[in-house]
Every structure is written in structure tokens, then in C-alpha cells.
Amino acid sequence: MCGPAMFPAGPPWPRVRVVQVLWALLAVLLASWRLWAIKDFQECTWQVVLNEFKRVGESGVSDSFFEQEPVDTVSSLFHMLVDSPIDPSEKYLGFPYYLKINYSCEEKPSEDLVRMGHLTGLKPLVLVTFQSPVNFYRWKIEQLQIQMEAAPFRSKEPCMAEEVCSMSWYTPMPIKKGSVVMRVDISSNGLGTFIPDKRFQMNINGFLKRDRDNNIQFTVGEELFNLMPQYFVGVSSRPLWHTVDQSPVLILGGIPNEKYVLMTDTSFKDFSLVELSIDSCWVGSFYCPHSGFTATIYDTIATESTLFIRQNQLVYYFTGTYTTLYERNRGSGSWIRVLASECIKKLCPVYFHSNGSEYIMALTTGKHEGYVHFGTIRDGQVSFEMLPRQWSVCEQIGVTTCSIIWSEYIAGEYTLLLLVESGYGNASKRFQVVSYNTASDDLELLYHIPEFIPEARGLEFLMILGTESYTSTAMAPKGIFCNPYNNLIFIWGNFLLQSSNKENFIYLADFPKELSIKYMARSFRGAVAIVTETEEIWYLLEGSYRVYQLFPSKGWQVHISLKLMQQSSLYASNETMLTLFYEDSKLYQLVYLMNNQKGQLVKRLVPVEQLLMYQQHTSHYDLERKGGYLMLSFIDFCPFSVMRLRSLPSPQRYTRQERYRARPPRVLERSGFHNENSLAIYQGLVYYLLWLHSVYDKPYADPVHDPTWRWWANNKQDQDYYFFLASNWRSAGGVSIEMDSYEKIYNLESAYELPERIFLDKGTEYSFAIFLSAQGHSFRTQSELGTAFQLHSQVDVGVVLADPGCIEASVKQEVLINRNSVLFSITLKDKKLCYDQGISGHHLMETSMTVNVVGSSGLCFQETHLGPHMQGNLMVPVFIGCPPGKRLAFDITYTLEYSRLKNKHYFDCVNVNPEMPCFLFRDIFYPFFLIQDLVTGDSGSFQGSYVLLVVGGGPTLDSLKDYSEDEIYRFNSPLDKTNSLIWTTRTTRTTKDSAFHIMSHESPGIEWLCLENAPCYDNVPQGIFAPEFFFKVLVSNRGVDTSTYCNYQLTFLLHIHGLPLSPKRALFIIMVSASVFVGLVIFYIAFCLLWPLVVKGCTMIRWKINNLIASESYYTYASISGISSMPSLRHSRMGSMFSSRMTEDRAEPKEAVERQLMT
């Protein structure tokens, strides 16, 4: 609607002069606290943008968040850190982006402010919260946060100053697998300028890509940079539909006659106008009675990975590229048309995911009237099913024609609530609420909506019993709204019906029947905003019966008058609301402003508390004459003056929020400014910290229950040495890494408010107290039997439970008469009735607790420097089941100690593996397990019962195989008759069917059998040592442990050595070994007996050979010298005789020596 509708003239003002003066005085008085806040606190705000890794230090740049993979740009720097507690051989990666942080105050340059803040000690603290993924079958459910301290960095711009001209603070922008939605909370360290905390949405945009020129562009269409006024001025607002807390990219259509949508990945802090690349075709047929064609995108729904749109009767979807969620090839290349043969008249959102999937509903007209197309989205894959599966809704409720107007899905009950319009012959149209169960395919008619609006007769609400009188105005329902936490159901149209049990409905008479609701914005935390067809805004607190008009109203008149006086850039005299939505329990508007023929699209907060307070004060005030003047006083309808929460327990045990802390490395520079290398090292340290968290899911428990223990385990003793190096500026690389700066936090303190959510295990309690200071004298005495007087308070507190059969609450009142106050102690407890067992964080039951101070709804406000805050109504979602962050681990440390104590010895494998110690086959195996709480750091012995099964195994790690169900039964069941048991125990307790043993920490232990048909029987040794075997062991407490809702399942490998051989193989080895041994003995004896003879024979053979050689030499010489003279011959004979004699003389002593040695 156009701007004037947002700035109504209001009712005619009284023309009495004093009343006009009082109105002006009222505006000043109501803004007085604001003026005081401006005087004492500068209106400063944090500013955060995203910068790529390579653009650190550049001014005026902001990057889009679409890169999702770690970058290898920091590993070379870690190799220089030789004198640091880290291991340079580890793999350190970085993230693609940094967070650049500044702040600004009104009428002051930002550069001067940031520089002043740095010099006064200001340091931004950044808390990044990773949203858990939808598909818990692929990713672990966890509530993870990392707190970082921003590092100061000088700008790269030219500077004439000696130290710094402009600067900013930087922290890494971490990315976690499975998470695409991240909240960034910026706060101050308490020094320097006071700056209120601020939250930013930093979500991954999977609908962006780089073109050939390295420019970023949208994959869904073409971005437009000119926001023409005709796109927004005079256009009706429309709802913003998305999966709550899971959608990284929001999309909003409704621009007339254009294929344009608004897209944002920062919840409209910034946005883009995109023309979608769809065909815009329209196919008319006899079953699809469309009267015309338009290019307008009517319905838009955003999920975790996929966008849905409806144009005319056509439905399209586009899946983003999210490598952190699934494979890269899941992203769409273009818009995909679904339900091509159907005529779709409306898309209905499903606000919450369940069972690892998200959902969407499409309502048809034409040939499949009376059916709902139910869409399921998981990991970017979309599938539709037509429901009901057999007969249409019309046929099952017994009418010939009907039309489904709206559909609401209650995920926890697998139920569709359908608003059905039906015709009965010539009668007028009637409306019913129909329930359809998607699991059982059962349909039930829940409620017949009255034909006419009831006559309230001045009452705020009216119970619909069928006996009340009615007006002549027909009911025209348009939709159904269900809050899964408190089970409240609203049927809305030109009326409001409310129910908590789907059977009995209450008519809320404050909403005028002359108006018609267009859509409802839901916070799911107890507040609902209503937008009518005439763009009026109404407000409702769930569970109460008052409906407040926010716009147009007297309160809005006062508020906008003050804003225009302050020349706020968020308000104008001509404005159009595009949508109304909740974010973090706060109501926001997306508004198009027209100032001096210039348009601007802004997101602004709707100050609900201020509007209600202004409206209350403008309607209820007194004029008292004192002397010669009138005194203005306001009536305070709030039953208390002060409300505080006390005795709040440590939040992490109930919120299941895991938090890490990471500080930047210390730079060895006089100015304290970081450089690109130190920031890159900061990136690598944060990455490694989160990597340690992701891999801390080993079945073998560490001696110290902390993911960071292994990081510093070998360097803690040298901490003083590293401190000495840093103190003397001798640390390598110019940075010093402090081990205590990277840790997991287990002792978060309560923030004096109820937690965002509460998880309750079996029989768990949550206790807190509410302190209320009453207005005036709110106590009375009353005599009761047995006491003289009993003190009673006029201030009462009520606790409303959505499921009283599952949880219970007790309230104890303590009257503090001397302080005119009351202390209410409230305890919420699980009743152990509504949940069986489940995996940690899976399939939790959703319910809620609401605490109301009687008579305070919409009337009580607390003044703060950030504005008024509504009090008296507290609503907390409660999740019943196995909380996230709890796991079962094999206590290898105590198991080894206890085994050594009981067996009197311990023998490890020959090849020792510290990560997987061995156990000897013949020893009794005493397993112990730990319940580790990853959130609080608690780690204690598992005291419950469990079933232990060997589900796989193999002689080596490479030959491991999983056993079939039949094999698992034969290898583990005491009922087995096939001689296949692997182990046994003296425990007599078994499951109900006696199939398996039930064990506990008090069990007598396990004896290994490996019978004849077991896989570990008769294994061939891989060497000279006894055979080994690896058992894959499954431990589960499902169905046998009643102490918890948690279905603990642990699978780990057990290394057993010293397995015995089968009798046949043992006999064979003995026979072979004995044969070899006997053969060796016989050979040795024979060798000892025959050796002297062999030596003697060898000697004689040698002597004969020598003689033979000498004889041959003599005869050869004689024949050659026969022709010589006789003297020569005679001389030769004498020489030869002399030589022979000399040879014989040498041989005789040699033979004598050999005989002596042989004897």
C-alpha cells in the first residue's frame, strides 16, 4: 500500500487547548528516557563486511559469501614457526574470507572513531554460531560456537602519519561442513566507547558463481541495479516464507508484471533485485481455468538449499551449489519445472524441518481438486507425492465438490491440517478443518467452522460451544497457523479462532470483523504479527486474548512524529511496506521509502514495546489540579515494578551449546598491529581448532576429555620456554602462539535470562526463580485453619505447559514482606512418559513452557538504554529426548588398568600401536565405557546396561568384513547350537528373547572362545608369532537401559592376539616341527661321527695329488733334457734327487702334525 497508509492521520484530536498541550508534553515525556540515553551513550553501532583473503586492508570493499572450500595459503607460514608449540608438519589450511569490523557513531568520522577505540583499548569480540544442518543422517547434530578476538590491522591506503591513519579489526570467517547459516554477534571487551551488541547474518549464497571475467553473477537470473519506484510503490505486501533458522538465502516476489524477486543472504541487511531466467509460459486447459496471464512471481519459498517459486499455475525450483552440504554436482544449472501436468493455485510453506528433510506443499485446482502435492527436499533433491494416496479429501468427507484453501504440516505428528471449503447442494459454502496423517493415510474431520461470526457482546474472547448467538457477517477463513512448540492453532480470515487441542476453539473478539487477515508473521516464541488486506498491523501474544493494533494507532502517531523530528533515515512521509517478518524474536519491516523523488529500500525494526507503551499512555492518564496548574500522571497497569530472574543454572547443560575460544597470535611489534602473515596464521589456527573438533569422535576415549588436549599434550611442559622467547621477542616468524588461547569453554555463565531452548533427558529438571517487586501494597493477610494469619500476594505467576502429560512444573512462592516482593521458585521436570530412546539430537519431541505474570500481557515494560523491553511473558521451547553432544566411548585407559589388575599381567602385541592396544586371547576381557558430554566436559563411567555384539572382523585391518544378521546371531547368541560362538560370559541376564547377553560395568568379563565355526577359529599365523584377529564390536543400550533417553551406539575395533590354533593345525605344526628337529639332530650326529674320516680322506687325497703332480714334473723334465751333455744330465739328476729329498723332508713333518691333530 502507498506511503500515506503507513502514516495515518488518526482520529480527530480534541480541540481543547489543554489537551493539545498535553499531547505535545506526552511525546516529550515518552521520549525523555531516549534523550537521557543519547546524552549518556553515543548511538554507536558495529559495522561488519566480508573480505576475501587477498583483499585484507583494502578500503571500501565488500565481498559476497559463496566460496566454501578451505584454501591452502597458510601452510608455508607454519613451516617458519620452528620455536612454537605447534607441530609444523601438521596440515594447516585457511578460510576464504575475513570479517572486517568497524564501528560508527552519529556525526563522527568512522576512521577517527576506530583509531580512538583502538588507542583506548577497545577490542571487538566476535561470536560465530553455526546452525545445525537439516540432514542429521549425513551430519552430526550440534550447537557449535567459536568466540574470537579481532586483531587490529592498518589499512593499505597511503598514509602520511607515522603510525596509522585508518585501521580496522579482522577475524577469520570460519566455515564448517554441514552448516550454511551462521550468526555473527559482535560485542565489546568493555573498554573504550560503549557500543551495544549487534548480530549479523553471514550465510553462504549457493546461487552465485564467477563468470569468465572472474565477475560474480547470479545463477538464477540476471541482477538489476535500478530499483524503479513502480516496482514497489503502491504494491501490496506479501509474506516472507522460508524454513526457520535454516535458509541461507531469502527470496521475496510480488513485483507486478515482472519476473523480478528480491534476494538476500544477510536477512535484508543488503539485497539484490534479480530477474529470473524462466520461460514465463502459460498453458491453459479445461482443467486449469486461469483467466489471464501475468509475469508476477506470486509465491516464493526458501529452504536450506533450494528456492521455490510459483508463476501463474507453474511451479519451479532451483537448487544452489553447496559443497558444504552435498556433492558439487547437485546444484541446478537452470530453473526446473515440477508438477508440469498440474494446475497449482498456491504454495504453502513448512516452517520446520524434520526427519532430516524439509517440506513444501502445493495446492491444486482442476482435475486433482481435493489433493495436496507434498514435496520433500533432502540434500537438494526434490520429490513430490500426491496426498491422500487413495481417495481425495472431498470423497472422504462425503461431499461432491471441495477445495483445499490452506495446508499446515505438523512435522512431529506427521499430520496435515487442511482448511477445506465444501459445498452441500444449494446450501452456502461451509468450511472444515481436516486432519490427515501422512504415515497411516488416515483422514479425520476435526472441526466445523461456524458459518457466521459470533456475537461477543463486549467480551475479549468467547468460547465456541454452539449455543452462542451470531452476527450476520459470514466467516471467511483463509488459513491455519500452528505453533509446534505450544500446540496452539489459529484459524484466521476476517476473524481469529484459537485452540490448544484442535477441538475447542476460542473466538478472539478484539480483532474487528470488518477487516480480513492477509497473512501472519510468526515468531514461534509467543508473539504473532497480523497483516490485513488494508495493510494494517496487529499484534497478539499467544495464550492471551488481547489483540493490539500497532498500525495505524495513536502509538504509531507518536512514534513516527518523534522519528521525523530526529530526521531518521528509516522513516518517511511516503512509504510502502513490502513484507513483515520475525528475526530472532524481533519484528521487522521491509519498507520502500520515497524522499524527494528518490526511493530507498530499508529494513527497520518495528518497536512493538514502544508502540504498546505509547498507546497505553495516550489512552490512560489523569489530570490533577494542584494549585493553579494541572499535573499529568499516567496509570501503570502492570502488577509489578521490577522483574528479575534468579538462581539460573549454568546454561550449557540445557542449551547444549558448545563453544571454543580463539585469540589472535601475539605479534612482536611495538605498535601491536598485525600484518598479513600474522592474520594468515590466525586463520590456520582457527581452522585447526575446528578440525580437532570435527575429528573428536573416536571410539577410543583420550586420557583427557578435551578435543584440544592432543594439540598441546607434548608441549605443555615447555610452556615457560615459549613464554621466555615471546617475552624477549625471539619467537620465530614474528608471532607468539599461546596454548591457553585456543581452548574449549565448559563454564559459561547465565546471562540473567532464560535460555533460547532447553533440552531435557529422562527425568531431568530445570529450576530457576522469578523475583517480582509488587506495585504499591499488594499483600493481604488471611486466617486459615491452624495458623493465625497467612500472608498472600496479589502478584501471581502461572506456568502453562504445552504437553502436561510429558512434563510437569512446580511453583513455590516466598513472600518477602520487607521488600514488598515475591520470589517464585519454578522447577520444570520430565515425567519419563513420552519418549522411548533415540540417537543423540535425533527425533526430539518439541514442547514448551510459558511463564506468565497474571495481568501483565502487553502492559509491562522494562526501560533500558536500548529501548523498552516487554516483561511478564516468558516462553521457552523444550526438547525432550537424547540431548545433542552426548556419546559413548571405550574407556581404554581404565580397561587396561583393570585387566592388568585382574589378570595379574598384561601382554601387548609385538608391534605396539598406542592408538589400539592389544588384549591377550587367554585373558578375561573386562570392557569399560564412558559417557562423555561434549558440551559440559563431563566424562564418567557408563553405569547403565548394554548389549555387546561382534558385528565384523578379520585377521588384518585390510581384510575386515561385516557380518550378516544371521552370522551376528550365531557368533554372539548364547542360544547358538552351531558351535560358532566367538565369546561368552558368566552373566545370566539376557534380552527378552534370550538372544543376547545384557552386560553392565559390574559384569564378570568376557571369555574368548572362537569355536570351530567362528571366523576367528584356526587362523594361519602371519609369522613366527601366534595368530591375531581384529573384532568389530558394537555396543548399544537400546531396549535394555532405562536410565536415559539416549540410544548410545558405539562401534570400535578390538585387537586380540595370542589366538590358539586348531588341534589339527597344531598337530600338523608339531609333527612338521618334530620332523625337522629330529632331522637336524640326526644330521648333527652324523656330521660329528663322519667328520674325522672326511678330514683324513681329504688329507690322503691331497697327498696323492701332490705326489702325482711331482712325478709328472720329473718325467717331463727328463725327456726334455735327454739331448744334453752328460755333465748336464748328471748335474740334473743330482739336482732332482736333492729336490725330491727336500720335498719328502717337508712332507714328513706336515703328515706328523696332521696325525697329531686327528688324534
Swiss-Prot record:
Residues 36-1065 are extracellular. Residues 1142-1159 have a biased composition (Basic and acidic residues). Residues 1-35 form the signal peptide. GO terms for cellular component: CatSper complex; motile cilium; plasma membrane; sperm principal piece. The chain crosses the membrane at residues 1066-1087. Glycans are attached at N102, N355, N426, N574. It is found in: Cell projection, Cilium, Flagellum membrane. GO terms for biological process: cell differentiation; spermatogenesis. It comes from the Eukaryota. Keywords: Cell membrane, Cell projection, Cilium, Developmental protein, Differentiation, Disulfide bond, Flagellum, Glycoprotein, Membrane, Signal, Spermatogenesis, Transmembrane, Transmembrane helix. Residues 1139-1159 are annotated as: Disordered. Disulfide bonds join C44-C105, C159-C165, C288-C343, C394-C402, C638-C860, C806-C834, C882-C1046, C909-C918, C1010-C1016. It is a single-pass type I membrane protein. InterPro entries: CATSPERG (IPR028246), CATSPERG_b-prop (IPR053871), CATSPERG_C (IPR053873), CATSPERG_Ig-like (IPR053874), CATSPERG_N (IPR053872). Its main location: membrane. It holds the Pfam family CATSPERG_beta-prop. Residues 1088-1159 are cytoplasmic. Component of the CatSper complex or CatSpermasome composed of the core pore-forming members CATSPER1, CATSPER2, CATSPER3 and CATSPER4 as well as auxiliary members CATSPERB, CATSPERG, CATSPERD, CATSPERE, CATSPERZ, C2CD6/CATSPERT, TMEM249, TMEM262 and EFCAB9. HSPA1 may be an additional auxiliary complex member. The core complex members CATSPER1, CATSPER2, CATSPER3 and CATSPER4 form a heterotetrameric channel. Belongs to the CATSPERG family. Auxiliary component of the CatSper complex, a complex involved in sperm cell hyperactivation. Sperm cell hyperactivation is needed for sperm motility which is essential late in the preparation of sperm for fertilization. This is Cation channel sperm-associated auxiliary subunit gamma.
